[in-house]
Amino acid sequence: MVKKVFGWIMPILIVGLLLVTMGTFKRSETLTTDEQKKISDYLQANP
């Protein structure tokens, strides 16, 4: 009984986790110009 439940809960959890991580990754990929400026300033100050 428990194995049956885990059999369909685990894939859903894994897919959900992947979607969440992909979503946050995509969001962090598209930085605002202000964020990009801060990062470039930081990189220039700390080579």
Curated annotation (Swiss-Prot):
* UniProt subcellular location: Membrane
GO CC term (a single one): membrane
Its record classes its membrane topology as: Single-pass membrane protein
Q: What name is this protein filed under?
A: Uncharacterized protein pXO2-54/BXB0062/GBAA_pXO2_0062
Domain of life (superkingdom): Bacteria
Q: What is the source species? A: Bacillus anthracis
Asked whether the UniProt record includes Transmembrane among its keywords, one would answer yes
Alphabetically sorted, this entry's keywords are: Membrane, Plasmid, Transmembrane, Transmembrane helix
Annotated transmembrane regions: 5-25
- List the NCBIfam families hit by this protein, alphabetically: CapE_47_fam
